[in-house]
């Protein structure tokens, strides 16, 4: 496991809320909490304010929270939650949205909160390197795989319509891009050829929703032939009887989602985080289609290990990757999106 900082048709596009609007919403939330003894991070007493990326919402509300409440540490603890595109969620916390536990899709968002002084610098210094759970990027297709999709290369050579979230708002989309890019490098292609492959797939992308959860919704509603997705999202869709199955590409990236308590968070938030890393908490993630960070609990029948599984550290970690690929002004992927007419702000 790697440290997050190592190395961290008609086109329809939906991206996150503008920064100014996020700040206004966050300010309204804080104002609505006036008169309490809450700290600057919004944590108080026995309440845990969760701000997280979109896909694990039901794992928290339906499984993790009730299981924790049944423990001796969780008695009397209350929860509030906000879930959405990872980048939007991080910007909301920066703007003042109450948060005592933050869980993002990729390390760049957590590092930004660390640099803003809202998360302690040692957030990633435990045995799991601050990672809540893992997944891999997969290719979700229609039942029976009518297009015969087996790898990222098929997205380049076949006449297919693709769905992936917008990489300027969605952490999941950034994992998708780096999975595709890395798979090409591992075939021996140059960095330019790998970036050209990313451009080709984005050209075939018919919709770029703001989050991974919204991208899955578009796919299950019948749009597109292939969805670049978290493995857990594909598993969820299959289990719910959607017209979906998925392919684990032979070469793909390990997804690591960082989690931390904010500075000045109540003890209940740390207790909940400790529960998430416990065997019981990790088993809950596994039961919901995520790969546990506790390797002793990994079921390799349910979660096959790809032939060529690589990490974000291979590209310099999320700080470097964010600057090189996803910076709105100078990032290589942002430049491709601008060329394709996709909003980047």
Residue locations for each model-derived region?
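Bacterial N-terminal signal peptides that target proteins for export
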Residues: 3-20
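C-terminal motif of bacterial Sec signal peptides marking the signal peptidase cleavage site
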Residues: 28-32
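N-terminal segment of the mature folded domain
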Residues: 38-169, 308
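Ligand-binding cleft/hinge of the Venus flytrap
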Residues: 66-73, 156-213, 217
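Short helix-loop capping/hinge motifs at secondary-structure junctions, enriched
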Residues: 144-151, 169, 182-190, 264-269
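Ligand-binding pocket segment of bilobal, Venus flytrap-like solute-binding proteins
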Residues: 187-252, 258
């Amino acid at each position: 496991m790697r440290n997050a900082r190592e190395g961290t048709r008609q086109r329809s596009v939906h991206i996150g809320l503008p920064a100014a609007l996020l700040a206004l919403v966050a300010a309204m939330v804080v104002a609505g909490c006036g008169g309490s003894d809450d700290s600057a991070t919004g944590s108080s007493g026995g309440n845990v304010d969760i701000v997280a990326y979109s896909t694990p919402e039901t794992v928290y509300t339906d499984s993790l929270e009730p299981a924790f409440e049944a423990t001796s540490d969780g008695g009397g603890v209350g929860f509030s939650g906000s879930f959405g595109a990872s980048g939007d969620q991080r910007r909301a916390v920066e703007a003042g949205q109450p948060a005592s536990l933050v869980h993002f899709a990729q390390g760049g968002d957590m590092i930004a909160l660390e640099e803003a002084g809202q998360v302690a610098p040692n957030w990633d210094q435990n045995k799991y390197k601050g990672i809540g759970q893992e997944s891999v990027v997969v290719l979700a297709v229609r039942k029976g795989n009518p297009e015969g999709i087996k790898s990222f290369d098929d997205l380049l050579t076949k006449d297919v319509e693709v769905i992936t979230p917008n990489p300027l708002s969605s952490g999941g989309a950034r994992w998708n891009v780096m999975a595709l890019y890395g798979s090409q490098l591992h075939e021996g292609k140059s960095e330019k050829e790998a970036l050209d492959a990313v451009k080709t797939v984005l050209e075939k992308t018919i919709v770029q929703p703001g989050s991974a959860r919204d991208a899955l919704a578009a796919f299950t509603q019948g749009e597109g032939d292939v969805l670049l997705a978290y493995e857990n999202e594909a598993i969820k869709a299959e289990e719910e009887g959607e017209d979906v199955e998925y392919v684990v590409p032979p070469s793909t990236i390990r997804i690591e989602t960082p989690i931390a308590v904010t500075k000045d968070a109540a003890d209940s938030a740390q207790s909940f985080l400790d529960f998430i890393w416990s065997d019981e908490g990790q088993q809950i993630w596994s039961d919901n289609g995520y790969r546990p960070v506790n390797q002793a609990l990994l079921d390799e029948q349910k979660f096959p290990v790809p032939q060529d599984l690589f990490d974000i550290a291979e590209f310099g970690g999320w700080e470097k990757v964010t600057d090189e690929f996803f910076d709105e002004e100078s990032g290589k992927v942002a430049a491709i999106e601008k060329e394709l007419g996709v909003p980047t702000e």
